[in-house]
């Protein structure tokens, strides 16, 4: 029988000092011997997705203590990618994922916690906590802050739905008046919560449901809705049930590595492809798989992308639907139900929401779908749950409204979620391309690519940084038919693998959204759409071919054939490579780029791998 980890610091005379300190935190005599549950919160006033999380730890703690545990809360950092975007702050976003993972590991292991509840929400916080949870392999439940309501405003007497990307595009579009731009800006992000489309934060929170580590509704229930309160309380109850199963019954199926196994990672990627999730999810799933010792690679993603249809289309891929609409259609469980009926899902995997013979968290995804898939459930409470809707009232407060849609969206032919027969497309929303530009692959969010752009041939317009590319786009240097190449923005070369939302937004605002392509060894915001190809691996700083592209080179992109090719002979490429090597210490470095890189970022860059490995640390440099 596994012994409580916390016994290390609570049992025996030699731990009298530790017990004295525990007592100073509020632990009583009769508490010693109970499991200590760490609550990793991420409250901050910097981030709308986290501004409402201050009291969520106390809510979870109340359920833990009622179930017989000791709850101890701590906080991690949280970077807002939207606020950090477009300047040097974006260099810190992806590296913050590793810091979050490490900080959770440090706190949990330093204090010998027995189990963990992760309260996350935005772009790098959920992935960082996921990496830590799988690294630690102690009972865990995830519960996020939830998505914000979609913005709404009237323009030219027409009511339109908005999100963050609309504000960015309007701000850069000279055809939009100052008055309309300001109106869009003020309406785009009306409430607390993660940005309202299928951007990175919401994509990752949805994927925790598919991995089996969070409760139904986690990825789609609005941050403002009163029903979300129960998710926090149930997370506390569930983690205690998992802890008791593991420590009292020696049931290893309660551990995250046995829940989030290879099949669960396939389920998560299947969901991601079907819902056209952010391309960043590829990066984070690859990183999480390594922490779980699961052999899940780009090859698996490529294989699955050819099999899974696109069943759910959400902003930024369409202005019609946002996360509140996904929830109305049944949320993640609604999409998984359609995937199951299409024969594309493993339903024999464990799930924290599944009960078996009255034992919480001991059943499989099959039983979760039977209860929570709105197309098959007979539970009226579940249907009521998925009818939770927006109030349309600006607020930073959680659980501030209890509005309901008049009905569920069960239209699987023309609704937000489709059946396989009526899919938006029979190939999914993400694809892996490869070729001499990206020998180890690159990623495109096909859900956001217009059909006319599925194949594209153009001339390279090369930039050594995102800043230079933005200047080139806004300055009129980029013209129709160009393939904008932004390099040395990968994990090592940036460092930090910046998001390229501003270049893609500015291409749209200049009327070039369908007339140009963009490729980069950096990454894209979940808010990106258009022919935007990121994660080029190997990156330029690691000797990738993207570093050898020259202005005017012909680049051929063929998404149906999963191909990206630089139309330059091998002889010429070898000559360019030799020339690069001849530069010695200056080889594989950007030409003329002026950028301050702090010591902290240099430390990250020293160990960073390319995107095809999840941009995680190169373990070979750390092992003896």
Curated annotation (Swiss-Prot):
It comes from the Bacteria. [2Fe-2S] cluster binds at residues 122, 195. Keywords: 2Fe-2S, Amino-acid biosynthesis, Branched-chain amino acid biosynthesis, Iron, Iron-sulfur, Lyase, Magnesium, Metal-binding. The active site is at residue 525. NCBIfam families: ilvD (TIGR00110), PRK12448.1 (NF009103). Its EC number is 4.2.1.9. One of its GO terms (cellular component) is cytosol. Homodimer. Pathway: Amino-acid biosynthesis; L-isoleucine biosynthesis; L-isoleucine from 2-oxobutanoate: step 3/4; Amino-acid biosynthesis; L-valine biosynthesis; L-valine from pyruvate: step 3/4. Mg(2+) binds at residues 81, 123-124, 499. Gene3D superfamilies: IlvD/EDD C-terminal domain-like. Belongs to the IlvD/Edd family. One of its GO terms (biological process) is isoleucine biosynthetic process. This is Dihydroxy-acid dehydratase. InterPro entries: Dihydro-acid_dehy_C, DihydroxyA_deHydtase, DiOHA_6PGluconate_deHydtase_CS, ILV_EDD_C, ILV_EDD_N, IlvD/EDD_N. Pfam families: ILV_EDD_C, ILVD_EDD_N. SUPFAM superfamilies: IlvD/EDD N-terminal domain-like, LeuD/IlvD-like. GO terms for molecular function: 2 iron, 2 sulfur cluster binding; dihydroxy-acid dehydratase activity; magnesium ion binding. It catalyses: (2R)-2,3-dihydroxy-3-methylbutanoate = 3-methyl-2-oxobutanoate + H2O; (2R,3R)-2,3-dihydroxy-3-methylpentanoate = (S)-3-methyl-2-oxopentanoate + H2O. Functions in the biosynthesis of branched-chain amino acids. Catalyzes the dehydration of (2R,3R)-2,3-dihydroxy-3-methylpentanoate (2,3-dihydroxy-3-methylvalerate) into 2-oxo-3-methylpentanoate (2-oxo-3-methylvalerate) and of (2R)-2,3-dihydroxy-3-methylbutanoate (2,3-dihydroxyisovalerate) into 2-oxo-3-methylbutanoate (2-oxoisovalerate), the penultimate precursor to L-isoleucine and L-valine, respectively. Its cofactor is [2Fe-2S] cluster; Mg(2+).
């Amino acid at each position: 029988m596994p012994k409580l980890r916390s016994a290390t610091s609570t049992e025996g005379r030699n731990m009298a000092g530790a017990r004295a300190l525990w007592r100073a935190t509020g632990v009583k005599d009769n508490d010693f011997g109970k499991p200590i549950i760490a609550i990793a919160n991420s409250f901050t006033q910097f981030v709308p997705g986290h501004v409402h999380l201050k009291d969520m730890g106390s809510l979870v703690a109340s359920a833990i203590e009622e179930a017989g545990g000791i709850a101890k809360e701590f906080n991690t950092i949280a970077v807002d990618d939207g606020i950090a975007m477009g300047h040097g702050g974006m260099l810190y976003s992806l590296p913050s994922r590793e810091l979050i993972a490490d900080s959770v590991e440090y706190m949990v292991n330093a204090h010998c916690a027995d189990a963990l509840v992760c309260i996350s929400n935005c772009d790098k916080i959920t992935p960082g906590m996921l990496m830590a949870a799988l690294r630690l392999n102690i009972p865990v439940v995830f519960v996020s802050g939830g998505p914000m309501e979609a913005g709404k405003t009237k323009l030219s007497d027409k009511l339109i739905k908005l999100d963050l990307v609309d504000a960015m595009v309007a701000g850069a579009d000279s055809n939009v008046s100052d008055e309309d731009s300001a109106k869009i800006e003020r309406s785009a992000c009306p409430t607390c919560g993660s940005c309202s489309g299928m951007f990175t934060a919401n994509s990752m929170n949805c994927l925790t449901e598919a991995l089996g580590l969070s409760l139904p509704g986690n990825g789609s229930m609005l941050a403002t809705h009163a029903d979300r309160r129960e998710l926090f309380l149930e997370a506390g109850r569930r983690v205690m049930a998992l802890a008791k199963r593991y420590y009292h019954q020696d049931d290893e199926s309660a551990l995250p590595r046995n829940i989030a196994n290879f099949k669960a990672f396939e389920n998560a990627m299947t969901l991601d492809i079907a819902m056209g999730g952010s391309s960043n999810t590829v990066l984070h799933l690859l990183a999480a798989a390594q922490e779980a010792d699961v052999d899940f690679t780009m090859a698996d993603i490529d294989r699955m992308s050819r099999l899974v249809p696109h069943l759910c289309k959400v902003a930024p891929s369409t202005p019609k639907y946002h996360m509140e609409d996904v929830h109305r259609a049944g949320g993640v469980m609604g999409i998984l139900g359609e995937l199951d009926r299409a024969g594309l899902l493993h339903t024999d995997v464990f799930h924290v929401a599944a009960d078996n013979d009255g034992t919480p968290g001991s059943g499989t995804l099959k039983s979760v779908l039977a209860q929570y898939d709105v197309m098959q459930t007979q539970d009226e409470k579940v249907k009521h749950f998925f009818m939770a809707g927006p109030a349309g009232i600006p607020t930073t407060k959680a659980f501030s409204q209890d509005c309901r849609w008049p009905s569920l969206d069960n239209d699987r032919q023309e609704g937000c979620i489709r059946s396989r027969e009526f899919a938006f497309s029979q190939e999914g929303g993400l694809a892996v391309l490869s070729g001499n530009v990206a020998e180890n692959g690159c990623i495109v969010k096909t859900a956001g690519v217009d059909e006319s752009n599925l194949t594209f041939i153009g001339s390279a317009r090369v930039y050594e940084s995102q800043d230079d590319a933005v200047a080139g786009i806004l300055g009129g240097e980029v013209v129709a038919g160009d393939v904008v190449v932004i390099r040395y923005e990968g994990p090592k070369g940036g460092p930090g693998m910046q998001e390229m939302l501003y270049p893609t937004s500015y291409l749209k605002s200049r009327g070039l959204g369908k007339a140009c392509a963009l490729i980069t060894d950096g990454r894209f915001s979940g808010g990106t759409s258009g022919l935007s190809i990121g994660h080029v691996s190997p990156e330029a700083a690691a000797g990738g071919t993207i570093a050898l592209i020259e202005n005017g080179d012909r680049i051929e992109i063929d998404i149906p054939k999963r191909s990206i090719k630089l139309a330059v002979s091998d002889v010429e490429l070898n000559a360019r490579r030799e020339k690069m090597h001849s530069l010695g210490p200056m080889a594989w470095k950007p030409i003329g780029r002026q950028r301050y890189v702090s010591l902290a970022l240099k430390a990250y860059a020293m160990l960073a791998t390319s995107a095809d490995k999840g941009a995680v640390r190169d373990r070979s440099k750390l092992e003896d």
